[in-house]
Amino acid sequence: MGKVGAGGGSQARLSALLAGAGLLILCAPGVCGGGSCCPSPHPSSAPRSASTPRGFSHQGRPGRAPATPLPLVVRPLFSVAPGDRALSLERARGTGASMAVAARSGRRRRSGADQEKAERGEGASRSPRGVLRDGGQQEPGTRERDPDKATRFRMEELRLTSTTFALTGDSAHNQAMVHWSGHNSSVILILTKLYDYNLGSITESSLWRSTDYGTTYEKLNDKVGLKTILSYLYVCPTNKRKIMLLTDPEIESSLLISSDEGATYQKYRLNFYIQSLLFHPKQEDWILAYSQDQKLYSSAEFGRRWQLIQEGVVPNRFYWSVMGSNKEPDLVHLEARTVDGHSHYLTCRMQNCTEANRNQPFPGYIDPDSLIVQDHYVFVQLTSGGRPHYYVSYRRNAFAQMKLPKYALPKDMHVISTDENQVFAAVQEWNQNDTYNLYISDTRGVYFTLALENVQSSRGPEGNIMIDLYEVAGIKGMFLANKKIDNQVKTFITYNKGRDWRLLQAPDTDLRGDPVHCLLPYCSLHLHLKVSENPYTSGIIASKDTAPSIIVASGNIGSELSDTDISMFVSSDAGNTWRQIFEEEHSVLYLDQGGVLVAMKHTSLPIRHLWLSFDEGRSWSKYSFTSIPLFVDGVLGEPGEETLIMTVFGHFSHRSEWQLVKVDYKSIFDRRCAEEDYRPWQLHSQGEACIMGAKRIYKKRKSERKCMQGKYAGAMESEPCVCTEADFDCDYGYERHSNGQCLPAFWFNPSSLSKDCSLGQSYLNSTGYRKVVSNNCTDGVREQYTAKPQKCPGKAPRGLRIVTADGKLTAEQGHNVTLMVQLEEGDVQRTLIQVDFGDGIAVSYVNLSSMEDGIKHVYQNVGIFRVTVQVDNSLGSDSAVLYLHVTCPLEHVHLSLPFVTTKNKEVNATAVLWPSQVGTLTYVWWYGNNTEPLITLEGSISFRFTSEGMNTITVQVSAGNAILQDTKTIAVYEEFRSLRLSFSPNLDDYNPDIPEWRRDIGRVIKKSLVEATGVPGQHILVAVLPGLPTTAELFVLPYQDPAGENKRSTDDLEQISELLIHTLNQNSVHFELKPGVRVLVHAAHLTAAPLVDLTPTHSGSAMLMLLSVVFVGLAVFVIYKFKRRVALPSPPSPSTQPGDSSLRLQRARHATPPSTPKRGSAGAQYAI
């Protein structure tokens, strides 16, 4: 499993990001390779992207501390493309901190003409297309048409209050990290560095500090040491006054710590080299440090002293405890690697992580790089049998396997979010390559239902998976996603967490006011939701919690998403309607809690203007922020709520120092807003006011008022709605059909949900619906659609299985093996369980409260042991057998065996292995009721069954320390009929060609035949054959009751066969695979099994009867030899491989027209 990302933006260029508050990082391209500018982000600070090719990925959570100075963003706020410099700014979730990455040294040298034009300021003041508006402003996004108007524009332009400060002496530095404390603080810290690409290290650094919001700066190199080279700047997320500086490990390994916002520092030596840090989300002095040699350290004194926790820790797989789920705030979750390369999940206290005090919450090994601890959930992955299996623990309870629809068969899974006690996951299924399906879970994170199919994905430069999904800030349950439909990518929106999706309505008019002829569903608005090619760069889509109705994004109008003809669009009513605001890409900042939008154009030329909108993007005014055009490297927005200050970072030329332009927006407001300056606005979806079960009314500033908002007040009022069907999604195992009903999927048995129930207890009997998590509706149909508690029925034991805890059939001599007794139905608490371990030891259990812990046993000798379990209660009994090898792994074994054969006929069983060459093998065969197995060195063996009925054959294959098994059931009768079935071609599109799918489809076909013909199910056996196209074999069996009486005659079989053929020829047999997918079942041709078999074991009377039939048949053949040609199937050659779907062993006795049943001898019908 790879890492997943979701966000917004264009991949056409590396972009800069302007965000709210916090930390800005400016660095040259290629620096990530050195690790000094772009360290690996820790998962707890990485929302939806990372680079590891395996294991779960996840999104960060509010309140999580950044592990490194690069916490990935929750939602991008502002982007700027500074030409050939790469820059991104991202905000750490829940900390109020923001970050950016930029490049300076990679700037190309412009031609002389370009340089001259840049230094004259041409291009920087070039206005967009359109007509000039009041005050000399132009319509945004359009170019000048009248030179006189352009001149008048420059003369009458509006100016913002700004000051410029140059970081003198740092002109060679190509990286910068900026921290703005905010929260009533005027302090800004800047760390600039010179990264030498040839040496791959930092050779110079400078530390600057401002105490007046960036008007002036003081150089602090003498306070940290003139020869000290600094590599990183860290800020405590819970106390912004605490600063930590990390020295370059190439020179020395030290920390410089400040508790007064960087005014003074204390230096501490380290005996290890820090690769990343993870701050505690609550305790400001608690830190985890990950070293370059994969050791994890902890400090309870903000880095002044360190203690080793664990060696061999997997990178980025360590986490702090989560309040509300863990009792101990100092508990550490980590994934550690053993000497032999396995991984396991450990927990321990930060200051007491000895061998005796470590816990292992998940028994056994997990897949490397798969541990995720996020909110109330813990996720791990375990691959067995070539398939990944995913496990979740909710609120630190026992792990349960995550349940996707049965035939999702995931290749890859990524945890996108765990907000509001629900898991949102992206799953790549067995038949997907560049798309993922979105699934949403119940509260425990166990049962998942489909939210959206075929969401577009792409792979980042470091191998991380990026999902085209964007969560809109400020509105619970609102997402945008790009879905692939017939090779076209279209943007969809949901307001109820994926229950319903719709296309985006395009604007009615363009920038010039001309009508846009775009009709749904053939034409719509499509938005770019990908992040930039730079893994630390956010994309060009923006929303903000404090402005819940405003969304700004780049995209296009048409039939599909395009990378050309990109414009900028804004919605001020939460995605219901959209307006075009620019014809070229811009980046937008939310100022004054979204009361003002600031836009800056993407251009490789120097600029000195930006655009402001005071009416949610309806109109824009042009302002200059500097008198000299500036190559913009990045922008840092206001960290506080009312400062209205923005800092622009850039250069006047490629030879100049860093220029810091402080822009103060307070002068554009004449007063603070009063109550009469606001109006109510109701959230809705195309007129529907009930969103997620509630009506929400927000307070918005009137568009004509130009006052400063200050603090955000949130929703004015919220009231719950009456529950309707729209507030409920289909429950696990159910699918929504065209009539809107949720009906069971073909593979799902609703009664299976009560199998773990004990008499006297109760379980939730699903109605097929479940309420959307976080939906606040009340009354209405809530009672009708909610699952009902139901008393557990008393049942006899059924479906008993005994397995080892790790699912293997081997155990080490002298070590504990845990046996799990699993009962599909039956009352565990009133059951007697008897276990015979096969080594002379047996135990009994009565009235067990739970079997979750399993039964432990130690085998003292090596060998194969027959473990038998007998379960009895007052209603019945059941038994199960496990053949346990006490010592061996093999990838896969499959038993090839006929579905049906004739009595006293030799049957060939073959073990098919994967991989086929695994060295010396031992085959252990169990069949019938034999208590002793047959052991061979060959993969094939012959059996003979002397009595009619169902028989079971089990093969176990041993190779070294690996043992795998497969079990098949074969029907044995003196006589039967068989018919080849075919299907409408659409079934092949959904055929993953695995045994489980074939068994379930066979069951569905049998059910359809029984319903269409009324033939009892005991007479019908359907076997779906492997391979494509999909085919099946229908067997008509002479069922008899358990007493051996009332056995069907040959004539009865003929009549049943004719009825089945007639029904199939009438196209009356069909089934619905999924909503909208109807599969028709056809008849191919029929063969028949003999009344007697041509073998010496039969009596003399039978031989006389056979000879008579032969003579009659010969006479008929002579008479009709020129009128009718009879084709007799031949037995296959010995080289025919079992598993070939066309293989059938048969000897025909009578020939009849294809439309009627043929009698003959069918020795065996083979399929895998």
From Swiss-Prot:
Secretion signal span: 1-33
Compartments it resides in: Membrane
Chief location category: membrane
Tissue expression notes: Detected in fetal and infant brain and in fetal retina.
Positions of the PKD domain: 803-894
Keyword Transmembrane: yes
Gene3D superfamilies recorded: 2.10.70.80, 2.120.10.10, 3.30.60.270, Immunoglobulins, YVTN repeat-like/Quinoprotein amine dehydrogenase
Residues in BNR repeats: 208-219, 256-267, 492-503, 569-580, 611-622
GO biological process: neuropeptide signaling pathway; post-Golgi vesicle-mediated transport
TM annotation in the entry: 1100-1120
One GO CC term, this protein: membrane
Protein's UniProt name: VPS10 domain-containing receptor SorCS1
Gene designation: SORCS1
